[in-house]
């Protein structure tokens, strides 16, 4: 993996902007890599820099996480429910990812698949936004085991590049009666164990291949994605509260269509 500094920074920005938006960070990294002609073999880079964006969640919600940890020490029911719901939501992707992720990636990790998934995902968001009414849950602590597990199952769809992990989990949560902002925040929290697991696995598999240049590229991309994600998360919650998810659906459809035309015409 040999990338220019400009490519590393741009990919870090793409990751930081798209990780928590329902637009597929992995899909955008694949398409951006195609446009910038990034060399093959950057999969570990793409996965590990996502952890930079995840760290932004930990920092922004540090007081809430500290309260949960303190509550667990006191056996506080709300803290226990919060932790339980995040872990239950993580379980399906941990199991299915360990078994099937490699095969799915080998078959579907192409720019064409990303473009089609962006379009179909955008249409799905518009449909769900129209159908969902009257949420019954307005907190992560208030989610049932069934809801948490259901969102976790839907998250497995995001193993298909272009689907979007945040998009799948947020739409799954909305469909199961979770309020918009809570659905977005649950998606943020669910990303922590999910991406920690994916990053650990990626680093373990690449442990004999990472040299100084690769490690430096990953470190730069990590820092850039962290800084950008810090700025994007609060903006995203404000947009969702005021306008819902339709703006992101239309973006997906337009971006996916443009990418598909470009890929087929070149």
UniProtKB/Swiss-Prot annotation:
Name recorded for this polypeptide: Undecaprenyl-diphosphatase
Localisation per UniProt entry: Cell inner membrane
Bilayer topology annotation: Multi-pass membrane protein
Organism lineage string: Bacteria, Pseudomonadati, Pseudomonadota, Alphaproteobacteria, Sphingomonadales
Reaction it catalyzes: di-trans,octa-cis-undecaprenyl diphosphate + H2O = di-trans,octa-cis-undecaprenyl phosphate + phosphate + H(+)
Highest taxon, organism lineage: Bacteria
Transmembrane domains' residue ranges: 3-23, 41-61, 86-106, 108-128, 149-171, 184-204, 220-240, 245-265
Principal location class: membrane
The entry's keywords: Antibiotic resistance, Cell inner membrane, Cell membrane, Cell shape, Cell wall biogenesis/degradation, Hydrolase, Membrane, Peptidoglycan synthesis, Transmembrane, Transmembrane helix
Entry's Gene Ontology cellular component terms: plasma membrane
A biological process term (GO) from this entry: response to antibiotic
Other remarks on this protein: Bacitracin is thought to be involved in the inhibition of peptidoglycan synthesis by sequestering undecaprenyl diphosphate, thereby reducing the pool of lipid carrier available.
EC number, UniProt record: 3.6.1.27
The organism of origin for this protein: Rhizorhabdus wittichii (strain DSM 6014 / CCUG 31198 / JCM 15750 / NBRC 105917 / EY 4224 / RW1)
Family that this chain belongs to: Belongs to the UppP family.
Record's function text: Catalyzes the dephosphorylation of undecaprenyl diphosphate (UPP). Confers resistance to bacitracin.
EC top class named in words: hydrolase
GO molecular function, one term: undecaprenyl-diphosphatase activity
